[in-house]
């Protein structure tokens, strides 16, 4: 769904400009205007993309949509999904070097043939306008709020050719805490998909970044079963899971030439999407006070929901 979001402010229609004038508006951490639409905040050009998507996307029953809040493991989940379906297309793997993940970035592997793979950062209620009653499947990946924030900070700094600018981090932190940030508030975003996964367990799968890190085999099998392409006992015995996990590991993906030199449709260099990918790295960048404040906010926002859920998820 990247093509729907790859717009400029000059692409705004008169209808969208009129809509924006009626919406709540705030300044983002980089000084760009944000407006609130259907409960979430968007840059004006992103809102145009959302509107275009809601009106123009034609879902197919076999579509797979990978969803996440930005910098929560989207690329990793995309790679795993591509690898799962690729093994069903080419089970023999006669030429492992011909695998599409070795010559393309996961963000660029959006097949036009069935099953089609898409990705989005919009919350579920906004996505649902486009998919309506389609049985297409949605896989959501959730990451610790603090790690996600730090990861977004790094890619913003890299995109601006700045080295770990603390001023930007502090601005992003304040924006996160207020909820006024692109695709935010964070807590509403994850709750939209979590609720959907409870209401539609056969259509929406809620996955957690931390759990994929601690139990990669179990989570990969869970993903494969949800997508309708479970591993056979023979595949498990011959190490198919290990092969996929190794190929889709961040160290392996980041070492590929295409991910060192290529660019995404919006001009961001693929290499900027890769960093450590570890759990708990926020401790190296956020102060203990910042971490405590985010934890306090998340507990407050999730107080009406299962304590077990947010302890495991966040």
UniProtKB/Swiss-Prot annotation:
Primary gene name: SOT3
Domain of life: Eukaryota
Role, per record: Sulfotransferase that utilizes 3'-phospho-5'-adenylyl sulfate (PAPS) as sulfonate donor.
Binding site for 3'-phosphoadenylyl sulfate: 71-76, 143, 151, 209, 275-277
Cysteines engaged in disulfide bonds, as pairs: none
Keyword GTP-binding: no
Documented EC number(s): 2.8.2.-
Active site residues per record: 121 (proton acceptor)
GO molecular function, one term: sulfotransferase activity
Annotated localization: Cytoplasm
Keyword list, A-Z: Cytoplasm, Transferase
One term under GO cellular component: cytoplasm
Transmembrane segments annotated in the record for this chain: none
Name this polypeptide is given: Cytosolic sulfotransferase 3
Family: Belongs to the sulfotransferase 1 family.
Pfam family, one: Sulfotransfer_1
PANTHER family: SULFOTRANSFERASE SULT
């Amino acid at each position: 769904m990247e093509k729907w979001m790859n717009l400029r402010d000059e692409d705004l229609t008169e209808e969208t400009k009129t809509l924006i004038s009626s919406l709540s508006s705030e300044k983002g951490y980089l000084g760009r205007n944000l407006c609130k639409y259907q409960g979430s905040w968007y840059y004006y050009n992103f809102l145009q993309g959302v509107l275009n998507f809601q009106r123009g996307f034609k879902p197919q029953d076999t579509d797979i949509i990978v969803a996440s809040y930005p910098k929560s493991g989207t690329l990793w989940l995309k790679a795993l999904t591509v690898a799962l379906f690729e093994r069903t297309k080419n089970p023999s793997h006669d030429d492992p070097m011909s695998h599409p993940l070795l010559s393309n970035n996961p963000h660029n592997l959006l097949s036009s043939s069935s099953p089609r793979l898409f990705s989005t950062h919009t919350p579920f209620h906004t996505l649902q306008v486009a998919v309506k009653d389609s049985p297409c499947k949605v896989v959501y990946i959730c990451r610790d709020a603090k790690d996600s924030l730090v990861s977004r900070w790094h890619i913003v700094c890299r995109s601006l050719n700045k080295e770990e600018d603390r001023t930007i981090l502090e601005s992003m932190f304040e924006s996160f805490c207020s909820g006024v940030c692109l695709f935010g508030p964070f807590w509403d975003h994850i709750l939209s998909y979590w609720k959907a996964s409870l209401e539609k367990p056969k259509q929406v799968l809620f996955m957690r970044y931390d759990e994929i890190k601690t139990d990669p085999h179990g989570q990969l099998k869970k993903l494969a079963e949800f997508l309708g392409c479970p591993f056979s006992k023979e595949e498990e015995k011959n190490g198919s899971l290990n092969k996929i996990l190794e190929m889709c590991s961040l160290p392996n993906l980041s070492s590929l030439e295409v991910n060192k030199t290529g660019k995404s449709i919006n001009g961001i260099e693929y290499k900027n999407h890769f960093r450590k990918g570890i759990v708990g790295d926020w401790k190296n960048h956020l102060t203990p006070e910042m971490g405590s404040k985010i934890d306090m906010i998340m507990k407050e926002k999730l107080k009406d929901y299962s304590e077990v859920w947010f302890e495991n998820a966040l």
